[in-house]
């Protein structure tokens, strides 16, 4: 994950100081891209521990169209706790937009099912896209989507994915986002009988929070290790039937966790 450390170092060195919604303050840079060849290893950061249950269960939660944190909490995942209301609800966030986007006729559109169909039947399409940025529902969301838009691309029997992330917490959030969408690409490729290609991460406002500066220094002092590999143990009937136990991250060797506060 040298690409990630290079990114972290660049923003630390040339980013500009900005205030932000959380009143924490950030060092920020606008626009960056990283490319990971998924056939050469699974892009999990090794210079600190990435909590894999959070990555996997959150993705399954998105795919289920769920927007209540009970499922996450039942599986030991707490990353959405701070934004939920007293009933555990988050409003029409990712799960709703991925699986139940409402059109002007108030009909529900399942974007995930649609892209699976497109990858299988019209792989050369330039419209294999999922968007979570529903302008008409932003005000009802506990937190507007940070990773807002992703597109699939098929060439030479390989499936690639590019994500656009409008707001990128580089130290805490981006390692999770890279892992999550890389996992989704593997799942989609398996469902569509393709090999994996590249995962491309593209960021808008890429920032390091001011209360993460010490943690960033610690991480940059560490040497990245060889990447893990992903083993998917079975092929379910569809993209929605995977479970946590279906995934094994082989030879994930990592340094100690580095704790940091989340900006709310």
From Swiss-Prot:
<dbReference type="Pfam" id="PF00303">
    <property type="entry name" value="Thymidylat_synt"/>
</dbReference>
<dbReference type="InterPro" id="IPR045097">
    <property type="entry name" value="Thymidate_synth/dCMP_Mease"/>
</dbReference>
<comment type="pathway">
    <text>Pyrimidine metabolism; dTTP biosynthesis.</text>
</comment>
<dbReference type="GO" id="GO:0005829">
    <property type="term" value="C:cytosol"/>
</dbReference>
<dbReference type="GO" id="GO:0032259">
    <property type="term" value="P:methylation"/>
</dbReference>
<feature type="binding site">
    <location>
        <position position="263"/>
    </location>
    <ligand>
        <name>(6R)-5,10-methylene-5,6,7,8-tetrahydrofolate</name>
    </ligand>
</feature>
<comment type="similarity">
    <text>Belongs to the thymidylate synthase family. Bacterial-type ThyA subfamily.</text>
</comment>
<protein>
    <recommendedName>
        <fullName>Thymidylate synthase</fullName>
        <ecNumber>2.1.1.45</ecNumber>
    </recommendedName>
</protein>
<feature type="binding site" description="in other chain">
    <location>
        <position position="21"/>
    </location>
    <ligand>
        <name>dUMP</name>
    </ligand>
</feature>
<keyword id="KW-0545">Nucleotide biosynthesis</keyword>
<feature type="binding site">
    <location>
        <position position="169"/>
    </location>
    <ligand>
        <name>(6R)-5,10-methylene-5,6,7,8-tetrahydrofolate</name>
    </ligand>
</feature>
<dbReference type="InterPro" id="IPR020940">
    <property type="entry name" value="Thymidylate_synthase_AS"/>
</dbReference>
<dbReference type="InterPro" id="IPR023451">
    <property type="entry name" value="Thymidate_synth/dCMP_Mease_dom"/>
</dbReference>
<comment type="subunit">
    <text>Homodimer.</text>
</comment>
<feature type="binding site">
    <location>
        <begin position="126"/>
        <end position="127"/>
    </location>
    <ligand>
        <name>dUMP</name>
    </ligand>
</feature>
<comment type="function">
    <text>Catalyzes the reductive methylation of 2'-deoxyuridine-5'-monophosphate (dUMP) to 2'-deoxythymidine-5'-monophosphate (dTMP) while utilizing 5,10-methylenetetrahydrofolate (mTHF) as the methyl donor and reductant in the reaction, yielding dihydrofolate (DHF) as a by-product. This enzymatic reaction provides an intracellular de novo source of dTMP, an essential precursor for DNA biosynthesis.</text>
</comment>
<dbReference type="GO" id="GO:0006231">
    <property type="term" value="P:dTMP biosynthetic process"/>
</dbReference>
<feature type="binding site" description="in other chain">
    <location>
        <begin position="166"/>
        <end position="169"/>
    </location>
    <ligand>
        <name>dUMP</name>
    </ligand>
</feature>
<keyword id="KW-0808">Transferase</keyword>
<keyword id="KW-0489">Methyltransferase</keyword>
<dbReference type="InterPro" id="IPR000398">
    <property type="entry name" value="Thymidylate_synthase"/>
</dbReference>
<dbReference type="InterPro" id="IPR036926">
    <property type="entry name" value="Thymidate_synth/dCMP_Mease_sf"/>
</dbReference>
<feature type="binding site" description="in other chain">
    <location>
        <begin position="207"/>
        <end position="209"/>
    </location>
    <ligand>
        <name>dUMP</name>
    </ligand>
</feature>
<feature type="active site" description="Nucleophile">
    <location>
        <position position="146"/>
    </location>
</feature>
<feature type="binding site">
    <location>
        <position position="51"/>
    </location>
    <ligand>
        <name>(6R)-5,10-methylene-5,6,7,8-tetrahydrofolate</name>
    </ligand>
</feature>
<feature type="binding site" description="in other chain">
    <location>
        <position position="177"/>
    </location>
    <ligand>
        <name>dUMP</name>
    </ligand>
</feature>
<keyword id="KW-0963">Cytoplasm</keyword>
<dbReference type="GO" id="GO:0004799">
    <property type="term" value="F:thymidylate synthase activity"/>
</dbReference>
<dbReference type="GO" id="GO:0006235">
    <property type="term" value="P:dTTP biosynthetic process"/>
</dbReference>
């Amino acid at each position: 994950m040298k690409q990630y450390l290079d990114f972290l170092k660049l923003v630390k060195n040339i980013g500009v100081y900005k205030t932000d919604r959380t009143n924490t303050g950030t060092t920020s840079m606008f626009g960056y891209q990283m490319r990971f060849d998924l056939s050469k290893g699974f892009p999990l950061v090794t210079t600190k521990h990435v909590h894999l249950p959070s990555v996997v269960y959150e993705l399954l939660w998105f795919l289920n169209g769920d927007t209540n944190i009970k499922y996450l909490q039942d599986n030991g995942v707490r990353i959405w706790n701070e934004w939920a209301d007293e009933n555990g609800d988050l409003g029409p966030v990712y799960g709703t937009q991925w699986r139940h986007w409402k059109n002007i006729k108030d009909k529900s559109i399942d974007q995930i099912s649609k892209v699976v169909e497109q990858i299988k039947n019209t792989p050369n399409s330039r419209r294999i896209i999922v968007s979570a940025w529903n302008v008409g529902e932003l005000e009802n969301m506990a937190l507007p989507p940070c990773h807002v838009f992703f597109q699939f691309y098929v060439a030479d029997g390989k499936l690639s994915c590019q994500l656009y992330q409008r707001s990128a917490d580089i130290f805490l959030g981006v390692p999770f986002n890279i892992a999550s969408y890389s996992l989704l690409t593997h799942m989609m490729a398996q469902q569509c009988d393709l090999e994996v290609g590249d995962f491309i991460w593209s960021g808008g406002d890429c920032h390091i929070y001011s209360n993460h500066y010490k943690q960033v220094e610690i991480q940059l002092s560490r040497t990245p290790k060889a990447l893990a590999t992903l083993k998917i143990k079975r092929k379910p009937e569809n993209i929605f039937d995977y479970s946590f136990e279906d995934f094994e991250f082989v030879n994930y060797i990592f340094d100690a966790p580095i704790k940091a506060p989340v900006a709310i």
